[in-house]
Every structure is written in structure tokens, then in C-alpha cells.
Regions:
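Short, charge-rich amphipathic interface segments used for partner binding and complex assembly
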Residues: 15, 19, 23-26, 30-60
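Short, charge/polar-rich alpha-helical segments
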Residues: 1-14
Length: 60
């Protein structure tokens, strides 16, 4: 993967995590809130992993 593609993925997953965090705050009940919190964590983790890969690519 090229650096631009990695950056795109980082931005994509950060955006998804942010949206899920907002949906968790707006959730009508605890189950929905919990679902979106877990999903936000998942997308945040993906963004973090892609950011690490991107940083390694930029250093190399």
C-alpha cells in the first residue's frame, strides 16, 4: 500500500469512530449506547493500527 492509501484509511476509520462516539452519546438506551461505544473502540483501534503502519512507512 502506498502512503496516500494508508492516510486515507486512517482518516476513514477516525471519522467512523467519531461518528460512532456521537451516536453513543445520542443513544436512546444503554444497549444502543454500549453498541456504539464498542464500535467506536473498534474503529479507533483500526485507525491507530493504520497510523502505526503509516509512521513505519514514513520512517523507512
Amino acid at each position: 500500500m502506498v502512503v496516500a492509501e494508508l492516510q486515507t484509511k486512517v482518516e476513514k476509520y477516525e471519522t467512523k469512530a467519531s461518528r460512532c462516539e456521537q451516536q453513543a452519546r445520542d443513544a436512546a438506551d444503554k444497549a444502543e449506547q454500549s453498541f456504539y461505544q464498542v464500535l467506536a473502540g473498534y474503529y479507533g483501534s483500526l485507525a491507530k493500527d493504520f497510523r502505526k503502519i503509516l509512521e513505519k512507512r514514513l520512517i523507512a
